[in-house]
């Protein structure tokens, strides 16, 4: 009788127990992360060949308590290693756990290694070699409090490495976890299974292996037990023979076309097809390149199956907000075409799962590497989505139709289509080339959350459909009242910059990492005005943000450009914007400083100044706070000192209810003319944005 331990992913213990019982295992003891059990040699080999859920299977050699480090050595030395290992085979010791005796796992591993080699040396005057990378045998030691477990890894490589997956996408899900997802999904054999975002096809391949009675270990050639002296080659060969026979029978019983995978990336589909061939399942699984938005049910109405998916959940790049549209569409397409089917979705993001707009009937908590994930199973009911009020769709179509007649639209790649036009849809919708940014204003607490959420999901879906934007190119942002410093804090770290065209100018935007994108499109005609006024001028861009105005001045053949902002992030962004327009030279300088202090200290004079000051600022880098309504006259006095006699200031602001008092401006010997209507652009007619042209009297 062999005493064994099968390890598994967190949350898979119950599935593993059921599997081992079916294989004939005895005296099972479930612990966190695995199961202890007993079995004859046939059970040992069957569990290695047939376990879909186990990560590894170990032979338990000995367990003992220790009072000091010498106890660890002595107890290990007393094991008859010469009856377990071959002298000529390499080995490696892995030690897990620490206590007040063994404070370092490497120290524990060395103690056990010394005991093993000393055992061999005592008998043969020779010792086996260590191999840290590809050992023939792995000895695993677990220390829990003062109890040590010593085991032999019979698996070799982890059991999830079935041998068929030679090609995979970024961050593929492990095969044994995929099997656990399939077995927990509610899918039944001989019913259709569709994965609409299949990646390298692991979920479908694992399901097809179950359906065709193909053993997960059938294609593996390397095993840890082959370097174990207790290995029974005859029993193993019989196990292998039976597994091959079962697959030969099982594949014939398998119904064709019951496993279908789709993915938007044709290259990924090619990888999945190669993996299926490696698994000898190419006759029962089909893969197609297809966007989620084109997903339809290929089966007859009476055939009920399961949709299964492990969609991206933003952990790798920390970008949940640009996956919202994907989850919305998955929910919508499921309800639209797969009534009465089951949907099973695996994700680490409860936030994103909420956008499926479905209630699960069963949940499973599983661990995917370091991530705690949830598998949620849903029953798909008749789609009620089309019955929602169409006022938003109609308004968006109307707005877009108007904009298409606008000549400027041919010259710009960023424009606004919707800006809170309807009271029930407090959204901003902006197009950036082939990307869509939708911003939702935080609803008041008096608004029913479910209604607001449903409206948002509807708006997101119809926005991308009406504007013909790919689902993967939709970014959602949530706006709430916040301090200015929060507005410019980094939210994510995708570093997803790309260039958009605005007239003759190239500008970098980043739709994901910050609340704002790096370009205020409502300033578009102000920037154009700056470009037309800047020829031969010394231009100053204060509170420069990402320096778009500086680029216009440079392309307008200004004499020099000074770009000033307190944020290093935006100074660097400004430099990149200037660089892609070939405007980096010694006359164009960038200064990271508090703008209010800098204009007092500078000795330079300017012909053209653009300033778009904040409503309020209280940065740690500033000595005093700034409030526009309170301090703008003082600001204008300081600007006057650095403005040349025939110079101009373009002053812009989006501050609510802010107006320059022309009489107060006159008192400081400046003349101000409101030019808001001159610089108002068709896609921002309602925007609370005002501009003035100011000069010396």
Curated annotation (Swiss-Prot):
Gene3D superfamilies: 3.30.2130.30, RNA methyltransferase domain (HRMD) like (3.30.750.80), Vaccinia Virus protein VP39 (3.40.50.150). One of its GO terms (cellular component) is cytoplasm. Pfam families: Methyltrans_SAM (PF10672), RlmL_1st (PF22020), THUMP (PF02926), UPF0020 (PF01170). It catalyses: guanosine(2445) in 23S rRNA + S-adenosyl-L-methionine = N(2)-methylguanosine(2445) in 23S rRNA + S-adenosyl-L-homocysteine + H(+); guanosine(2069) in 23S rRNA + S-adenosyl-L-methionine = N(2)-methylguanosine(2069) in 23S rRNA + S-adenosyl-L-homocysteine + H(+). Belongs to the methyltransferase superfamily. RlmKL family. Specifically methylates the guanine in position 2445 (m2G2445) and the guanine in position 2069 (m7G2069) of 23S rRNA. This is Ribosomal RNA large subunit methyltransferase K/L. The gene is rlmL.
């Amino acid at each position: 009788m062999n005493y064994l331990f099968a390890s598994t992913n967190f949350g898979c213990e119950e599935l593993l127990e059921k599997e081992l019982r079916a294989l004939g295992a005895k005296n099972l003891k479930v612990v966190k992360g695995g199961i202890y059990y007993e079995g004859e040699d046939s059970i040992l080999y069957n569990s290695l060949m047939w376990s879909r859920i186990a990560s590894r299977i170990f032979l338990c050699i000995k367990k003992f308590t220790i009072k000091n480090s010498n106890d660890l050595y002595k107890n290990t030395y007393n094991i008859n290693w010469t009856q377990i290992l071959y002298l000529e085979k390499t080995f490696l010791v892995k030690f897990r756990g620490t206590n007040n005796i063994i404070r370092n796992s490497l120290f524990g591993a060395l103690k056990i290694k010394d005991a093993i080699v000393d055992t061999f040396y005592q008998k043969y005057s020779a010792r086996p070699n260590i191999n840290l990378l590809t050992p023939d045998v792995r000895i695993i030691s677990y220390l829990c409090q003062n109890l040590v477990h010593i085991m032999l890894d019979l698996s070799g490589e982890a059991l999830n490495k079935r041998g068929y997956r030679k090609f995979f996408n970024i961050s593929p899900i492990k095969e044994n976890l995929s099997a656990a997802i399939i077995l927990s999904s509610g899918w039944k054999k001989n019913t259709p299974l569709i994965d609409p975002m299949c990646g390298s096809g692991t979920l479908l391949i694992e399901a097809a292996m179950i359906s065709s009675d193909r053993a997960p270990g059938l294609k593996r050639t390397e095993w840890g037990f082959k370097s174990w002296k207790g290995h029974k080659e005859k029993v193993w060969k019989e196990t292998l023979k039976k597994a091959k026979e079962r697959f030969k029978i099982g594949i014939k019983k398998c119904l064709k076309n019951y496993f279908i995978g789709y993915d938007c990336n044709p290259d990924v589909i090619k990888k999945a097809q190669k993996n299926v061939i490696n698994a000898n399942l190419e006759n029962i699984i089909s893969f197609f390149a297809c966007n989620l938005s084109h997903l339809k049910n290929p089966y007859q109405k009476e055939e009920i199956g399961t949709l299964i998916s492990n969609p991206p959940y933003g952990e790798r790049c920390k970008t949940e907000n640009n996956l919202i549209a994907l989850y919305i569409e998955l929910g919508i397409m499921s309800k639209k075409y797969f009534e009465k089917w089951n949907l099973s979705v695996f994700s680490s993001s409860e936030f994103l799962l909420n956008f499926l707009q479905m209630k699960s009937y069963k949940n499973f908590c599983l661990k995917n590497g370091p991530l705690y994930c949830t598998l949620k199973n849903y029953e798909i009911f008749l789609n009620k989505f089309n019955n929602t009020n169409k006022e938003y769709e109609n308004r968006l179509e109307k707005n877009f139709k108007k904009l298409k007649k606008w000549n400027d639209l041919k010259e710009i790649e960023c424009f606004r289509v919707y800006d809170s036009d309807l009271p029930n849809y407090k959204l901003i919708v902006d197009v950036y080339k082939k990307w869509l940014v939708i911003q939702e204003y935080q609803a008041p607490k008096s608004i029913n959350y479910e209604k607001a959420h449903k409206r948002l999901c509807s708006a997101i879906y119809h926005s991308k459909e009406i504007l013909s934007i790919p689902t993967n190119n939709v970014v959602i942002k949530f706006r709430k009242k916040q301090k200015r410093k929060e507005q410019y804090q980094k939210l994510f770290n995708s570093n997803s910059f790309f260039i958009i065209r605005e007239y003759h100018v190239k500008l970098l935007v980043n739709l994901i990492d910050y609340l704002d994108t790096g370009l205020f499109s409502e300033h578009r005609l102000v920037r154009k005005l700056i470009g037309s006024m800047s020829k031969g001028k010394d231009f100053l861009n204060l509170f420069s943000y990402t320096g778009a105005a500086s680029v216009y001045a440079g392309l307008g053949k200004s004499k020099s450009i000074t770009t000033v902002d307190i944020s290093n992030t935006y100074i660097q962004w400004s430099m990149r914007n200037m660089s892609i327009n070939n405007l980096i030279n010694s006359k164009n300088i960038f200064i990271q400083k508090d703008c209010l202090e800098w204009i007092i200290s500078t000795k330079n004079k300017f012909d053209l100044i653009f300033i778009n000051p904040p409503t309020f600022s209280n940065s740690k880098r500033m000595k005093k706070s700034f409030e526009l309504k309170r301090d703008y006259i003082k600001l204008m006095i300081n600007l006057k000192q650095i403005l040349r006699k025939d110079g101009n200031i373009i002053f812009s602001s989006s501050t609510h209810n802010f107006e320059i008092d022309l009489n107060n401006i006159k008192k400081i010997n400046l003349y101000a003319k409101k030019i808001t209507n001159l610089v108002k652009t068709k896609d921002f007619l309602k925007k609370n944005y005002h501009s003035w042209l100011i000069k010396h009297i």
